[in-house]
From Swiss-Prot:
Cofactor: FMN
EC class: oxidoreductase
Organism whose genome encodes this protein: Cronobacter sakazakii (strain ATCC BAA-894) (Enterobacter sakazakii)
Source taxonomy: Bacteria, Pseudomonadati, Pseudomonadota, Gammaproteobacteria, Enterobacterales
Flavoprotein among keywords: yes
Protein name per Swiss-Prot or TrEMBL: FMN-dependent NADH:quinone oxidoreductase
Gene3D superfamilies tied to this protein: 3.40.50.360
Matching Pfam families: Flavodoxin_2 (PF02525)
InterPro entries membership: Flavodoxin_fold, Flavoprotein-like_sf, FMN-dep_NADH:Q_OxRdtase_AzoR1, NADH:quinone_OxRdtase_FMN_depd
Alphabetized PANTHER family for the sequence: FMN-DEPENDENT NADH-AZOREDUCTASE 1, FMN-DEPENDENT NADH:QUINONE OXIDOREDUCTASE
Function recorded in the entry: Quinone reductase that provides resistance to thiol-specific stress caused by electrophilic quinones. Also exhibits azoreductase activity. Catalyzes the reductive cleavage of the azo bond in aromatic azo compounds to the corresponding amines.
């Protein structure tokens, strides 16, 4: 039995293309892997705090006493990391906002990227500590950006996930959804076909 963690980050709720794709993924995964456990965390509906000058002090080793707000942030960070480590498949629904990922997803990454916990520095360089995972990124875009300099989502997510130890990463693209109904329908159809292939793999 595998455990699947689905991270949603779109601010558009039910109107979101990436949320629709993640919902489709969950449906298909449950159909093919009925014994598996699926956890869905919606980072837009239930946002995590923005890392600031106070909160960053909670995530770095220190003997200084923590403020109540820092204690809350550290507890949440511990919870998010434990959740991430407990799952085998990580599904990230990441729409493109202004060429990059949503703020809500970046805030999540800022709380799970902790030196000595999810990565560490060695004499040979950084080493990821979140290992043995498979990641699937479902990314929707209004325009066409794949394999062009305007796609900052793909390289950033590949880099971040690899940095914390997740190197088995597949991307599913739904592009051109703002180019009209016909293009949007085709983008969804192609993305769902790609999801079907990954779910069955």
């Amino acid at each position: 039995m595998s455990k699947v963690l689905v991270l949603k980050s779109s601010i558009l709720a039910g109107y979101s293309q990436s949320n629709q794709l993640s919902d489709y993924f969950v449906e298909q995964w449950r159909e093919k892997h009925s014994a598996d456990e699926i956890t869905v965390r919606d980072l837009a509906a239930n946002p995590v705090p923005v890392l600031d000058g106070e909160l960053v002090g909670a995530l770095r080793p220190s003997d200084a006493p923590l403020t109540p707000r820092q204690q809350d942030a550290l507890s949440l960070s511990d919870e998010l990391i434990a959740e991430l480590q407990a799952h085998d498949v990580i599904v990230i629904a990441a729409p493109m906002y202004n060429f990059n990922i949503p703020t809500q997803l970046k805030n999540y990454f800022d709380l799970v990227a902790r030196a000595g916990v999810t990565f560490r520095y060695t004499e040979k360089g950084p080493e990821g500590l979140v290992t043995g995972k498979r990641a699937i990124v479902l990314t929707s875009r209004g325009g066409i950006h794949k394999d062009t300099p305007t796609d900052l989502v793909t390289p950033y997510l590949s880099l971040f996930l690899g940095f914390i130890g997740i190197t088995d990463v597949n991307f599913v693209f739904a592009e051109g959804v703002a180019y009209g109904p016909e293009m949007a329908t085709k983008a969804q159809s192609d993305a769902k076909a790609a999801i079907d292939a990954l779910v069955s793999a």
